[in-house]
């Protein structure tokens, strides 16, 4: 059981003070004209992860000036990390209901996050009929319900549902490439990610996906671009960075959680890949995200006359 950092002051992502230091957060934002959520979100520097957004009812306005575009029921948007967020209810609509999922992707999702239609860096696609809108509504709702369930593996199950949503989006995008990563490579990645604390051998992974070790090694490098052991090390460091940012666990415990029983070896690997020691990374992350002289950033929710910055 991890101990969350005390900086997160309240658990509602629609209200100020919520920390998005998680792999997955999902919700529904029901904006009504003159209601408590009727303001424009303004995040000039974006967020650390992605947000995928589905308009269910009404109309939303994205950006202003020459870059303005609007989203209607069935429109999907994908905001990449660090991309500018400026959006709210369209003045010509009395409401904007949109489902959303904030997430930090698994490494092998990269191709699924390259949407081919974009406006100012924001991925866009439209579901062509109401049947698809209802299907995607259920996918978003299932992710939210699972993520909030408090079940033992709620985050992992939510990520698996999100994976399905992203693949369905690719299927419905007429401009997406026909070739998607081999499902055996995807399964190998999932198996490795689920067992980061252990020392899985390549032959164990190969047996899990019903391939020979040599065939898996060749296929993995061909489709992912690096070998299996290097990819596993990447995932361990990514997981360690998140735990350093969002928990109060000791560095030794975090090392063990991601597969390094020797704290000194963990620190050496971390420094080699990140450029600083785990303790320095935690300190710098805390200083950046929670500076002592400033209040917590607003996320999703404080009503002011024109916009909310975060």
Swiss-Prot record:
Record-linked InterPro entries: AraC-bd, AraC_XylS_family_regulators, Homeodomain-like_sf, HTH-like, HTH_AraC, HTH_AraC-typ_CS, Tscrpt_reg_AraC-type_HTH
Keywords: Activator, Arabinose catabolism, Carbohydrate metabolism, Cytoplasm, DNA-binding, Repressor, Transcription, Transcription regulation
Signal peptide bounds: none
Keyword Transcription regulation: yes
GO BP, sorted A to Z: arabinose catabolic process
Gene3D superfamilies given in the database record: Homeodomain-like, Regulatory protein AraC
Gene Ontology MF annotations: DNA-binding transcription factor activity; sequence-specific DNA binding
GO cellular component: cytoplasm
Pfam families: AraC_binding, HTH_18
Binding site for alpha-L-arabinopyanose: 13, 29, 43, 87, 98
DNA-binding region (UniProt annotation): 203-224, 251-274
Annotated localization: Cytoplasm
Domain called HTH araC/xylS-type: residue spans: 186-284
Subunit note: Homodimer.
Cross-referenced NCBIfam families: PRK10572.1
Function text: Transcription factor that regulates the expression of several genes involved in the transport and metabolism of L-arabinose.
Protein name: Arabinose operon regulatory protein
Biological source species: Dickeya chrysanthemi (Pectobacterium chrysanthemi)
